[in-house]
């Protein structure tokens, strides 16, 4: 509405779009873009002015990362290049609609219960000593300075290379 547009810079009316639920897994580029376009259009109609897009669910990436493998939540196989960059596309689509795009990362979760195979360049494969297992998941040990520094590198990579309007660090999966 016109009123929503007037207050869009004073009110943060955001919606979270997650990948970890598998809604995109195995979709073609066109189908995923069609799904996301529909979601963005509906959220815009509802007055949302920001999208919080999950780009790192398990030390993987829904963007062309300098550090981590492509997410299995895109193609069904971790490390498989989907042939496009969902984060770059989402930034363009959100900005075209006058919406902000905030990148959402899960900093320490390294493997969900549903992931059976990790890519060869995954942190848990390269440095298993930096990860612990708990309840079927792998978690980067937050007590290790090297892991905290690694997450800072990942964040720096995102904010330097992408025109994100914000960054959300979200995790509540610790034992």
Question: For each predicted feature, which ranges?
Answer:
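Short catalytic/ligand-binding loop motif for oxyanion handling, primarily in non-cytosolic enzymes
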Residues: 59-63, 109-114, 175
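Catalytic domains of carbohydrate-active enzymes, especially glycoside hydrolases
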Residues: 34-61, 161-165
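Boundary at the C-terminal end of the N-terminal hydrophobic targeting segment
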Residues: 2-4
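A mature extracytoplasmic/lumenal domain signature
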Residues: 19-21, 55-57, 67, 105-107, ...
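Aromatic-lined carbohydrate-binding/catalytic grooves of carbohydrate-active enzymes
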Residues: 46-82
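Aromatic- and glycine-enriched glycan-recognition loops and surfaces
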Residues: 27-46, 73-97, 149
């Amino acid at each position: 509405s016109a009123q929503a547009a007037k207050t869009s810079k004073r009110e943060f009316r955001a919606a979270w779009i997650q990948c970890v639920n598998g809604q995109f897994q195995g979709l073609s580029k066109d189908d995923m873009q069609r799904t996301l376009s529909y979601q963005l259009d509906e959220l815009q109609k509802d007055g949302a002015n920001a999208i919080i897009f999950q780009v790192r669910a398990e030390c993987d990436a829904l963007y062309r990362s300098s550090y981590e493998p492509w997410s299995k939540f895109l193609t069904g196989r971790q490390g498989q290049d989907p042939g496009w960059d969902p984060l770059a596309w989402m930034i363009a689509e959100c900005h075209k609609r006058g919406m902000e795009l905030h990148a959402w990362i899960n900093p320490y979760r390294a493997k969900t219960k549903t992931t059976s195979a990790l890519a060869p360049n995954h942190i848990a494969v390269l440095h298993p000593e930096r990860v612990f297992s708990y309840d079927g998941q792998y978690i980067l040990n937050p007590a290790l300075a090297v892991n905290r520094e690694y997450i800072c590198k990942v964040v720096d990579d995102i904010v330097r290379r992408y025109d994100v309007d914000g960054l959300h660090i979200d995790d509540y999966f610790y034992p």
